[in-house]
């Protein structure tokens, strides 16, 4: 009986956090507001505990993290082609995401967790020129909003 009361108290203490968690949808598109081969939106703000779901609206896309663009404590992920991928945000910071087949076309996006700024060296990761230019544009837009 005592153990049940402790378990119930623990669940009640955690309930507000799970109730506040949001699900954020990101579409993988051949064409969107920002041009061709894009994530939409290209910049999202999330909080620890939120889930970001990448939706393969158009075929030929995936979503995966870029080495060196994931905060400590956050798991990297590699989504399969044409498959939905759900990612729980577990650490504050900035997460860089790419569609591997369309990296050279600049198909990238940023998840900002907890209002964090891009850490120094965030754009130092190895990536095609168009991807880096897209990240610079996305970060500038995100800072302005």
Give the positions of each predicted feature.
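N-terminal signal peptide c-region/cleavage motif recognized by signal peptidases
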Residues: 16-18
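Extracytoplasmic copper-binding redox domains, predominantly the cupredoxin/blue-copper superfamily
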Residues: 21-145
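Bacterial N-terminal signal peptides that target proteins for export
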Residues: 1-7
């Amino acid at each position: 009986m005592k153990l049940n009361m402790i378990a119930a108290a623990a669940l009640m203490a955690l309930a507000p956090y799970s109730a506040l968690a949001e699900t954020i949808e990101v579409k993988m598109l051949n064409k969107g507001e920002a041009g061709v081969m894009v994530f939409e939106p290209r910049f999202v703000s999330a909080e620890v505990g939120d889930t970001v779901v990448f939706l393969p609206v158009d075929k030929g896309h995936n979503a995966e993290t870029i080495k060196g663009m994931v905060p400590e404590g956050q798991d990297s992920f590699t989504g399969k082609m044409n498959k939905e991928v759900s990612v729980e945000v577990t650490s504050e910071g900035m997460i860089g995401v790419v569609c591997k087949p369309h990296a050279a076309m600049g198909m990238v996006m940023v998840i900002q967790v907890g209002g964090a700024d891009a850490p120094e060296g965030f754009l130092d990761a190895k990536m095609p020129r168009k991807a880096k230019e897209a990240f610079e544009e996305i970060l500038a837009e995100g800072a302005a909003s």
